[in-house]
A protein has these predicted regions:
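Feature marking well-ordered beta-strand scaffolds used for ligand recognition
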Residues: 1-410
Length: 410
C-alpha cells in the first residue's frame, strides 16, 4: 500500500506520516521487534483474529507484509515479546464482550515459544507452556534465561507473577511465583467480587527487581535477586481516587533517573469511570515510592469536532508506553515518553524535568471508515500500542486501522 492510500491525520504536531500497511484488514494490537542482518522485523498480534503477523519495516515507507501465523481457535493471542531470536506469544481465555465464545474454553492457554533466529519471517514453534488455568496476558522477555509472565494460576484470583526458566526454550520450567495476599482463594484477605486485583503485566525485570503493574492493587516492587524466592519491597496504591479497574496498567522504571513512569488504562467509553492518568513516581527510595508529578491531559486541537476528547466517543485516556526493554533495535531515550491515548492518538512527552512533564508532539489518525471489530461502540480512532526503533521510526496500531509508521520531527 502506498502512503497516498494511508488514512490521513485529523491533526498532528511535530510528527510526520512515513508509511502505512492495512495488514490485510487484520486489526493490530501489540508490537515487538527484532533486527536480523540489518533488517527490521515487526511481530504483531491482532484483535478479533487469532494469530500473528510478520512485517519487514527495513524500508519504513514501504512496509512489507511477510507472513501470517494462524493461532488457536477461540483464544486471545494479544501479547508478543521477542529477543535473542526467541518469540514468546501469549495465549489467553477471551473475556466477555469481545464477540467470541466466552463460555467455551480456549483452544490453548499459556504461552507459545518460537524460534525466529534463522528465519525471522517463519517462526518455528519450539514449545507450549500451560498455566493450568486461563492463560497469560502481558509478559516480559528481553533475552537471557528468564521470562516474566502475567499468568493465571490455580488457587489464585486473577493473574499473578510467574517466572519461567527458558534457557532451554523447547522445555520451559517454572522457577517461582509471586502473588499478593488478596489473591489467594479462600484466604483471610480474599477480596469480594468486583474489588479483586490482578497482575496486569508486564513485569519490568531489571537490576534484581521486578516492577509490577497490579491494576487496583497498585505499583508493586518485588525483590528477585533470589529468583527462586521473590519477596515484596513496597507497594504504592493510586486507586482510589485515580484510575479505572486497571488503575496501574504499566510501570516502566528508569533507574538512572530515580523514577518510574506509570499509567492506568482507560476502559469505559466517554470517560465513564474515575480519572485516568500518567504519572512520574519517585523510586529513589524503593521502600517508599511516592507520586512526583502528573502528565497534562491532552487537549483537542483548534477546530476539532468536540470541545474535549471524552465527548468524542470511544475510549479516551492512556494505554501503552513505548517499552525499550534494553533492546538494541529500539530507541533508548530517557527524556521522552511515547504514549498511545486511544481517541487522542499518539502523544509524545518531554520528561527532562520530571517535576513538569510537557507534551511536545501528537498524531491523531483519521477515524476508520470500515468496522473490523465490535469495538469501540462509536467508530473512532483508538490508538493502541506504540514502539520506536533505534532509527526513530514510530509504529502505532489501532483497533480498526492498520499499522501507522511515523517520525517525530523534533
Amino acid at each position: 500500500m502506498s502512503i497516498s492510500q494511508a488514512p490521513r491525520a485529523i491533526a498532528s504536531k511535530n510528527i510526520d506520516l512515513i508509511g502505512y500497511n492495512d495488514l490485510k484488514e487484520r486489526p493490530a494490537f501489540k508490537i515487538a521487534m527484532q533486527e536480523v542482518n540489518g533488517r527490521f522485523y515487526l511481530y504483531l498480534s491482532h484483535f478479533w483474529v487469532s494469530g500473528w503477523s510478520v512485517i519487514d519495516v527495513t524500508e519504513p515507507d514501504k512496509p512489507e507484509y511477510l507472513n501470517f501465523i494462524e493461532g488457536p481457535d477461540n483464544t486471545w493471542t494479544l501479547q508478543v515479546q521477542v529477543a535473542e531470536g526467541i518469540l514468546i506469544t501469549s495465549l489467553e481465555k477471551i473475556p466477555p464482550g469481545w464477540g467470541t465464545r466466552p463460555d467455551d474454553p480456549p483452544e490453548a492457554e499459556g504461552i507459545y515459544i518460537w524460534d525466529v533466529s534463522t528465519d525471522p519471517a517463519t517462526p518455528k514453534l519450539l514449545s507450549h507452556w500451560e498455566t493450568g488455568s486461563d492463560g497469560t496476558h502481558r509478559n516480559f522477555y528481553n533475552g537471557g534465561k528468564y521470562a516474566h509472565l502475567s499468568a493465571c494460576c490455580p488457587g489464585y484470583d486473577g493473574q499473578i507473577y510467574r517466572i519461567l526458566d527458558v534457557s532451554d526454550p523447547s522445555s520451559p520450567k517454572e522457577v517461582s511465583k509471586f502473588a499478593l495476599p488478596e489473591q489467594k482463594q479462600g484466604g483471610k484477605e480474599e477480596l469480594e467480587e468486583g474489588l479483586r486485583i490482578f497482575q496486569h503485566g508486564p513485569a519490568h525485570a531489571e537490576n534484581g527487581r521486578a516492577y509490577l503493574p497490579y491494576a487496583r492493587g497498585g505499583m508493586v516492587v518485588v525483590n528477585i535477586e533470589d529468583i527462586n524466592n521473590p519477596t515484596i519491597v513496597s507497594r504504592l496504591n493510586v486507586y482510589p481516587p485515580l484510575g479505572s479497574a486497571i488503575a496501574v496498567h504499566t510501570v516502566y522504571p528508569y533507574f538512572s533517573k530515580g523514577f518510574a513512569i506509570a499509567n492506568s488504562e482507560a476502559l469505559k467509553e466517554k470517560c465513564d469511570e474515575p480519572l485516568n492518568y500518567t504519572a512520574i513516581i519517585d523510586i529513589s527510595d524503593e521502600t517508599n515510592p511516592r507520586l512526583k508529578s502528573l502528565f497534562p491531559v491532552p487537549e483537542p486541537p483548534k477546530g476539532y469536532t468536540h470541545k474535549n476528547f471524552c465527548e468524542r466517543g470511544g475510549r479516551f485516556g492512556p494505554h501503552n508506553q513505548h517499552h525499550a526493554q534494553g533492546l538494541d533495535c529500539l530507541e533508548q531515550k530517557e527524556d521522552r515518553i511515547y504514549l498511545t491515548y486511544f481517541n487522542a492518538g499518539l502523544r509524545i512527552y518531554d520528561i527532562s524535568d520530571p517535576n513538569l512533564p510537557r507534551e511536545i508532539a501528537y498524531y491523531i489518525p483519521s477515524d476508520p471508515t470500515k468496522r473490523l471489530g465490535l469495538l469501540p461502540e462509536t467508530l473512532v480512532t483508538q490508538s493502541e500500542d506504540v514502539l520506536v526503533d533505534r532509527r526513530g521510526y514510530i509504529y502505532v496500531t489501532d483497533k480498526n486501522h492498520g499499522l501507522h509508521i511515523l517520525k517525530c520531527s523534533i
